[in-house]
Amino acid sequence: MNYLVNYCKISFYFLMSISLSLFLISLKFLLMDLVYFIEWEILSLQSMSIVMTFLFDWMSLMFMSFVLLISSLVIFYSNQYMEEDYNINRFILLVLMFVMSMMMLIISPNLISILLGWDGLGLVSYCLVIYFQNVKSYNAGMLTALSNRIGDVALLLAIAWMLNYGSWNYIFYLDMMKNNIEMMIIGGLVMLAAMTKSAQIPFSSWLPAAMAAPTPVSALVHSSTLVTAGVYLLIRFNDVLMNWWMAQFLLLVSGLTMFMAGLGANFEFDLKKIIALSTLSQLGLMMSILSMGFYKLAFFHLLTHALFKALLFMCAGSIIHNMKNSQDIRMMGSLSMSMPLTCSCFNVANLALCGMPFLAGFYSKDLILEMVMLSYVNVFSFFLFFFSTGLTVCYSFRLVYYSMTGDFNSSSLHPLNDSGWTMLFSICFLTVMAVIGGSMLSWLMFLNPAMICLPLEMKLLTLFVCIVGGLMGYLISDVKLFFTNKALYFYNFTNFVGSMWFMPVISTLGVINYPLKLGLYSYKSFDQGWSEFFGGQMVYFQLKNYSLYLQEFQSNSLKIYLLSYMLWFIILLMLVVLVN
């Protein structure tokens, strides 16, 4: 076991040191406005050369530093969380492969090398989702892999289309993509790929299903790697989104995703799925502000969200670990008494998610909402932004109400306490980052902050929405023994909203089961029904009837001759009468 512990610690120290180094280098690149474009010639054969390209700027270096920071803390956290697992060695290697794939995607200005990282993420995520080998995990892994395959196909088509232009380095063609109609096809395909990876409507169903993976994987995947890959790719292709119809389409889809995830989380009782739906809501927020042209704001929220979302998952993992793998929040309650440190960190992460002033989420989320108020958006988009913000606060307060207040609803013989120092170290480190990360990044990234001049009512609108959302979260979860749950009064609505607008059913049964049933009905109606009746069997029966009819003629020859003689005699008689 000591060998495995050291294995985790070596990975932790190695990744943490690289993360700090990259962060300092990214600050230098940011302040001096440096960009390094590196070409590495892998193979040169006569007139042919294979060249690998890397793009290092402040954005890629800073994102890599955050990915490595969270990865190192997740691996250190896994040292205790997965201590009873025999295959922890394999688990750490899979996580490292996952991080390597993400690195490849971040520093690539070339669609081919992006596809390597993109496919690497898809493949390793499948291996991690099915890590706990049971039927539910296999189904979730298959749904994750097949949903992401659509994006892979879109990227392959974009690569094929770029053959028309002589290079796969998309970064040279971004200006061309804004005006050239044929290059807009590449932008559309990349947008489709990003929508599948970042789980936008109609590809949202795989993200909550991926919660079948171990909790440390969820902390890594849903904070800074897999789901943010699509957002990061669109940040790189942000010039393409200046095309008005693509931007309008993305704004509508991402706004609806944000709204759908916020509503769904208010009717969910699985702890990890609630946090997964909050990730989906924040991804919709990033995509929508990106479609409005504020790519730096989207990147800023991407980084701050990575900090508090990883913290949320780690605290949830600690709670699940102590609850003996129970994830139902109705079984929890009064956890703040038995796990005070974990619950304190959990509440800090929740408040950062809600946009509580001076925490990490406030600096990015409040800025995004103020820029929305300054921009020219219609009432529907405005409603989606602010209503979704209220829903975020609503499900966060509901989650705290169910899990941390009231009475303990599980076995009374179940001792609970804070986890060991290994898990608590990662949790406390990220708590500090969730408190100071937003202000630190805002001072570093926006050297000349924009002047935002708004009336007092609009300035206070965000705070008002958060307060109303918190009150609603308390009221809808206030359930007593003599007071039924209000959701039961609207069962059909609850069923529709709680199942993510039936998207998991449509994505699985809708793609496989219903077409198969349609084929079965067609087979019975046409192949075994009308076509068989009018086709093969009908021809056989008709020929058989004609044959029998003709045989009747042959067997009754005397009668037929007499009948024909009489007919012809009558006809001749009539002709004679007519002539005379």
Swiss-Prot record:
GO molecular function: NADH dehydrogenase (ubiquinone) activity
GO cellular component: mitochondrial inner membrane; respiratory chain complex I
Residues passing through the membrane, by range: 12-32, 50-70, 92-112, 113-133, 153-173, 183-203, 215-235, 244-264, 274-293, 298-320, 343-363, 367-387, 427-447, 463-483, 496-516, 560-580
Listed Pfam families: NADH5_C (PF06455), Proton_antipo_M (PF00361), Proton_antipo_N (PF00662)
InterPro entries per UniProt: NADH_DH_su5_C, ND/Mrp_TM, NU5C-like, Proton_antipo_N
Keywords noted in UniProt: Electron transport, Membrane, Mitochondrion, Mitochondrion inner membrane, NAD, Respiratory chain, Translocase, Transmembrane, Transmembrane helix, Transport, Ubiquinone
Domain of life of the source: Eukaryota
Reactions that this protein is recorded to catalyse: a ubiquinone + NADH + 5 H(+)(in) = a ubiquinol + NAD(+) + 4 H(+)(out)
Protein location: Mitochondrion inner membrane
Broad enzyme group: translocase
Membrane topology label: Multi-pass membrane protein
BP GO annotations: ATP synthesis coupled electron transport; electron transport coupled proton transport
Annotated EC: 7.1.1.2
Signal peptide boundaries: none
Functional description taken from the UniProt entry: Core subunit of the mitochondrial membrane respiratory chain NADH dehydrogenase (Complex I) that is believed to belong to the minimal assembly required for catalysis. Complex I functions in the transfer of electrons from NADH to the respiratory chain. The immediate electron acceptor for the enzyme is believed to be ubiquinone.
Protein family membership: Belongs to the complex I subunit 5 family.
Record's protein name: NADH-ubiquinone oxidoreductase chain 5
Taxonomic source organism: Anopheles gambiae (African malaria mosquito)
Gene designation: mt:ND5
